[in-house]
Amino acid sequence: NNCPHDWLPMNGLCYKIFDELKAWEDAERFCRKYKPGCHLASFHTYGESLEIAEYISDYHKGQAEVWIGLWDKKKDFSWEWTDRSCTDYLTWDKNQPDVYQNKEFCVELVSLTGYRLWNDQVCESKNAFLCQCKF
């Protein structure tokens, strides 16, 4: 694996939690600037989401929720990944997504679920975030 030592290697990609609190779009911009081809993280299997949850539980300092790369760009309940990968796996927390007050269009990992389940959230909320890169 070619991942730097504090990144999680998985399926040919590398993942890292950043504890700095940012709004969703700023977090995506940060990941993209980190290295070409980087994005907020995407997930495609239950196994991946468990491994990520374990990694975040081990390395995340603080209690903040964690942004991932899923968003409802068109605001029409069509969730998509910023890396344009296939939206083939969704693991929402119960009663989510609810697009509460028609304002929640970005997706976070919920700390109370051990970072295993997802919630839609107001994109301007400040969260920690998970970048995914190829090195």
From Swiss-Prot:
Signal peptide: none annotated. Ca(2+) binds at residues 96, 98, 104, 119-120. Gene3D superfamilies: Mannose-Binding Protein A, subunit A (3.10.100.10). Residues 10-132 form the C-type lectin domain. Transmembrane segments: none annotated. GO terms for molecular function: carbohydrate binding; metal ion binding. CDD domains: CLECT_REG-1_like. A motif (Galactose-binding) lies at residues 96-98. Coiled coil: none annotated. It is found in: Secreted. Keywords: Calcium, Disulfide bond, Hemagglutinin, Lectin, Metal-binding, Secreted. Expressed by the venom gland. GO terms for cellular component: extracellular region. InterPro entries: C-type_lectin-like (IPR001304), C-type_lectin-like/link_sf (IPR016186), C-type_lectin/snaclec_domain (IPR050111), C-type_lectin_CS (IPR018378), CTDL_fold (IPR016187). Pfam families: Lectin_C. Disulfide bonds join 3-14, 31-131, 38-133, 106-123. Belongs to the true venom lectin family. Beta-galactoside lectin that agglutinates rabbit and human erythrocytes in a calcium-dependent fashion (MHC is 0.21 ug/ml on rabbit erythrocytes). Galactose (15 mM), lactose (20 mM), rhamnose (20 mM) and EGTA strongly inhibit this activity. Homodimer; disulfide-linked. This is C-type lectin APL. It comes from Agkistrodon piscivorus piscivorus (Eastern cottonmouth).
